[in-house]
């Protein structure tokens, strides 16, 4: 069964669940920045690409605890870590133009991350073009677009981005999109940054044309947050938690519960899907407070991008410009 996830860190976990030893062709690094866990997954060659089912390149994951307890200061702290992570991948100077693309359907809250980020990006390309003498020389030209989805526009997202890119000729493209996760605890708590581009809709079985350097002719940095999880995954995780509690309190049935717990996770999820599918179909689940979470996460990501693209400015200056 194909496990629905867009996260490289979860692809790593899937491999480790089924194989012993290190992942061939993959370099891993884990460390913490305060309360934030950072995982770097570098797919080095075709061997690693096959093992991980991920394109050759770098994937960096920030796992953030306490999603509902953010204050402004902590949001800015996360944004600065995101910016610090982005900067080595961007490799652009003051004169290079960046195109920021907010992927997703703005009418569906869990899929509206990209458009919400674009609303808060510091857009400067028009100022550099029309009033160059009135703005700081260190400000980089940045433009943004929310191309919508095929069902709204009737045009493939990649076709819109390709046409815009051909016209304005950016030096780098940043794509922001909502992702899918296989773990409940990562939904709306994880930010993935990668330099291999993105396949919109892949995590929910609705794969569109890929957005990467090969298709667009420009380096593409992808930034994503898992906002949904498969209903079968929720059921699977719930069963595991129930079994854990039963094992703790059971005396004579402990071995039976341990046997159930030891069943292959993917096999359990496949069986759950078979049971659920006739009743609910392909169901994806998101938290009930997703509106508030989207506002917080989009602000974190947009601020991180603004800091990374405008290193000559202080955060106060960026916020002043946006307000």
Curated annotation (Swiss-Prot):
Keywords of the record: Hydrolase, Protease, Zymogen
PTM notes: Autoproteolytically processed. The inactive tetrameric zymogen termed p46 autoprocesses to a smaller form termed p41, which is active only during spore germination.
Prosequence residues removed at maturation: 1-6
Catalytic activity: Endopeptidase action with P4 Glu or Asp, P1 preferably Glu > Asp, P1' hydrophobic and P2' Ala
EC assignment: 3.4.24.78
The UniProt record lists the keyword Protease: yes
Gene3D superfamilies reported for this sequence: HybD-like
InterPro entries cross-referenced by the UniProt entry: Pept_HybD-like_dom_sf, Peptidase_A25
GO MF assignments: metalloendopeptidase activity
One GO term of the biological process aspect: proteolysis
Name of a matching Pfam family: Peptidase_A25
Its biological purpose: Initiates the rapid degradation of small, acid-soluble proteins during spore germination.
Family: Belongs to the peptidase A25 family.
Family annotation (HAMAP family): Germination_prot
Quaternary assembly: Homotetramer.
Protein name, entry field: Germination protease
The organism of origin for this protein: Clostridium tetani (strain Massachusetts / E88)
UniProt gene name: gpr
């Amino acid at each position: 069964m194909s496990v629905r996830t867009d996260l490289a860190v979860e692809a790593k976990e899937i491999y480790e669940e089924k194989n012993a030893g290190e992942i061939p062709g993959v370099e891993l690094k884990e460390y913490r920045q305060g309360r934030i866990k950072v995982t770097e997954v570098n797919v080095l060659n075709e061997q690693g690409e096959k093992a991980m089912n991920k394109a050759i390149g770098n994937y960096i994951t920030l796992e953030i605890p306490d999603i509902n307890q953010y204050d402004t200061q902590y949001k800015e702290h996360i944004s600065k870590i995101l910016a610090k992570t982005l900067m080595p991948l961007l490799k652009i100077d003051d004169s290079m133009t960046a195109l920021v693309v907010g992927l997703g359907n703005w009418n569906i809250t869990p899929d509206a991350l990209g458009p919400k980020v674009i609303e808060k990006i510091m857009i400067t390309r028009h100022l550099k073009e029309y009033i160059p003498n009135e703005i700081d020389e260190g400000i980089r030209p940045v433009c943004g677009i929310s191309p919508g989805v095929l069902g709204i526009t009737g045009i493939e997202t990649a076709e819109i981005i390709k046409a815009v890119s051909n016209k304005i000729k950016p030096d780098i493209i940043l794509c922001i999109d909502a992702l899918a996760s296989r773990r409940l605890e990562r939904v709306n708590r994880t930010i993935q940054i990668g330099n291999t581009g993105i396949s919109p809709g892949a995590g929910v079985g609705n794969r569109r044309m890929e957005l990467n350097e090969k298709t667009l002719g420009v380096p593409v940095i992808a930034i994503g947050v898992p906002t949904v999880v498969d209903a079968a995954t929720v059921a699977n995780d719930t069963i595991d938690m129930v079994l854990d509690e039963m094992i703790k309190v059971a005396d004579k049935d402990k071995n039976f519960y341990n046997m159930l717990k030891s069943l292959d996770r993917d096999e359990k999820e496949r069986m759950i899907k078979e049971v659920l599918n006739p009743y609910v179909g392909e169901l994806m689940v998101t938290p009930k407070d997703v509106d508030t979470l989207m506002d917080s996460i989009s602000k974190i990501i947009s601020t991180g991008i603004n800091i990374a693209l405008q290193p000559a400015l202080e955060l106060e200056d960026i916020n002043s410009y946006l307000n």
